[in-house]
């Protein structure tokens, strides 16, 4: 069943120009009684949709997979992945790409239904999703967007009227995810594992045309592709670290070629600064701990380089050298981006030799005194040194003098320094206890007002507005560590 186009659907399906081994065409599985519980108005408008039309029953049916919009071409994408270091052939086990929306400005975005039913890649899964994890992805992805961190986004969440069974019976839901594309490091691993150089080349050419058209005429365009992805990921991971975001499941199937954050299953934001922070219940070894994220990104990108080896160069020795040289650039690029970001967080415009030491000393003290990561930088930005173990310590007072004298030595005024800090230190993040509170109200009581208030506050994290202050309060200390789950 195909619906008409008053809502503004303008779908293309360029992914189907790839060899058919990369996808399986399959319709979504209908649900019994869909209900729209969240629509992203501003995102809808930017994509060329009419939000009021999207609220109508006929369009809600599309978000539920009960109907298809004009021009839809539903398919599940195939890919592989190293999951916690172990290689598997995978694919969209509970999601369908229904098409690529062409926006009024000529941009192309994947429209994917997540939780739309089983596919040939489901393995033993039911292809469905629960309401809590889908609302969680909506909240966190929109918070990331407001923090100016490249991310997939959420257009809508519908409940299905059907239960989903995990450890317990949960209300089912479908999320409409929007992405620049869903091409992953794992997509290239999939092509390489199948052994067809032609397919691998087709994927690389398609990816370049879609994401990096400026390198199409490059003499060594596949090396240039690797360079671009490394650059994008170095920038992305630096941005994660600078706001204390912990992804939780940095498997190669969750590393996008576009440089967007994808898959918000077991992610969370750090409260107390600790390099070893882990939230994911399945990351028992701390593989994807906060401090490990840059190293794991480099590891994942090395898997991309391995996958590209058949098309990087004909000479075996030369190709290994190219791959190793490019991967070694990741840490340099990451460190540069992170250091620049940290300098902005401390209001440092100019360069001085001891800047690195100044930053490291602060972080060391924050870890020692278990200081709240976001609120420490917030207090420095507001120049309100509160009564905390960190700020009361003699070593911090000594550091504070050094920092103040460093600010005084630069040409820019202190006012300008504090303004730059304000633009780089969010006063509000999606605190784990606040997210849980919003999900509990929505899922258990059908009360979405708590989530709406939270989303409103998170939409402007650099505002330092008085009405946001209740969301700046860290959780009450507890002996029970906060744990996240992938929701699959």
From Swiss-Prot:
Keywords: ATP-binding, Magnesium, Manganese, Metal-binding, Nucleotide-binding, Nucleotidyltransferase, Transferase. Mg(2+) binds at residues 254, 263. The active site is at 253 (proton acceptor). Its EC number is 2.7.7.-, 2.7.7.108. Residues 108-127 are annotated as: Disordered. Disulfide bonds: none annotated. Pfam families: SelO. Its cofactor is Mg(2+); Mn(2+). ATP binds at residues 91, 93-94, 114, 126-127, 177, 184, 263. It catalyses: L-seryl-[protein] + ATP = 3-O-(5'-adenylyl)-L-seryl-[protein] + diphosphate; L-threonyl-[protein] + ATP = 3-O-(5'-adenylyl)-L-threonyl-[protein] + diphosphate; L-tyrosyl-[protein] + ATP = O-(5'-adenylyl)-L-tyrosyl-[protein] + diphosphate; L-histidyl-[protein] + UTP = N(tele)-(5'-uridylyl)-L-histidyl-[protein] + diphosphate. One of its GO terms (molecular function) is ATP binding. InterPro entries: SelO. Nucleotidyltransferase involved in the post-translational modification of proteins. It can catalyze the addition of adenosine monophosphate (AMP) or uridine monophosphate (UMP) to a protein, resulting in modifications known as AMPylation and UMPylation. NCBIfam families: PRK00029.1 (NF000658). Belongs to the SELO family. This is Protein nucleotidyltransferase YdiU.
């Amino acid at each position: 069943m195909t619906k008409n186009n008053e809502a503004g659907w303008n779908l293309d399906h360029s992914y189907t120009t790839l060899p058919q081994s990369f996808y399986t065409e399959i319709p979504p599985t209908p649900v019994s009684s869909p209900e729209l519980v969240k629509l992203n108005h501003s995102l809808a408008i930017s994509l060329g949709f009419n939000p009021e039309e999207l609220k109508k029953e006929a369009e809600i049916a599309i978000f539920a997979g009960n109907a298809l919009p004009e021009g839809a071409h539903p398919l599940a994408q195939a890919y592989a992945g190293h999951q916690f270091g172990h290689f598997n052939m995978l694919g969209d086990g509970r999601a369908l790409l229904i098409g690529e929306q062409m926006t009024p400005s000529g941009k192309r975005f994947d429209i994917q239904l997540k939780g739309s039913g089983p596919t040939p890649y489901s393995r033993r899964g039911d292809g469905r999703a629960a309401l809590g994890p889908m609302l969680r992805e909506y909240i966190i992805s929109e918070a990331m967007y407001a923090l100016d961190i490249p991310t997939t986004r959420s257009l809508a969440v519908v409940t299905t009227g059907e239960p989903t069974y995990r450890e317990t019976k949960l209300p089912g839901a479908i999320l409409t995810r929007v992405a620049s594309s869903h091409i992953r490091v794992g997509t290239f691993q999939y092509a390489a594992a199948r052994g067809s150089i032609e397919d691998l080349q087709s994927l690389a050419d398609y990816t370049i045309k879609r994401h990096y058209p400026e390198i199409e005429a490059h003499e060594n365009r596949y090396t240039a592709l690797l360079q671009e992805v490394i650059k994008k990921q170095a920038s992305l991971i630096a941005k994660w670290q600078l706001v204390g975001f912990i992804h939780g499941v940095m498997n190669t199937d969750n590393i996008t070629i576009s440089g967007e954050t994808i898959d918000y299953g077991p992610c969370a934001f750090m409260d107390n600064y600790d390099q070893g922070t882990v939230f994911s219940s399945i990351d028992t070894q701390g593989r994807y701990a906060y401090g490990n994220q840059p190293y794991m990104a480099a590891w994942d990108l090395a898997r991309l380089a391995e996958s590209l080896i058949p098309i990087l160069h004909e000479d075996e020795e030369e190709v290994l050298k190219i791959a190793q040289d490019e991967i070694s650039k990741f840490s340099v690029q990451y460190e540069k981006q992170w250091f620049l970001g940290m300098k902005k967080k401390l209001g440092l415009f100019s360069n001085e030799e001891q800047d690195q030491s100044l930053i490291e000393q602060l972080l060391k003290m924050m870890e020692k005194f278990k200081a709240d990561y976001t609120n420490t930088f917030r207090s420095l930005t507001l120049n309100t040194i509160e009564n905390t173990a960190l700020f009361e310590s003699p070593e911090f007072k000594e550091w504070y003098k050094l920092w103040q004298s460093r600010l005084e030595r630069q040409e820019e005024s202190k006012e300008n320094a504090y303004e730059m800090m304000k633009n780089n230190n969010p006063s509000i993040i999606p605190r784990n206890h606040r997210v849980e509170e919003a999900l509990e109200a929505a899922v258990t009581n059908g009360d979405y007002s708590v989530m709406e208030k939270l989303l409103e506050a998170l939409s402007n994290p650099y505002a330092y507005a008085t009405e946001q202050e209740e969301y700046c309060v860290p959780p009450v200390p507890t002996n029970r560590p906060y744990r996240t789950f992938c929701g699959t």
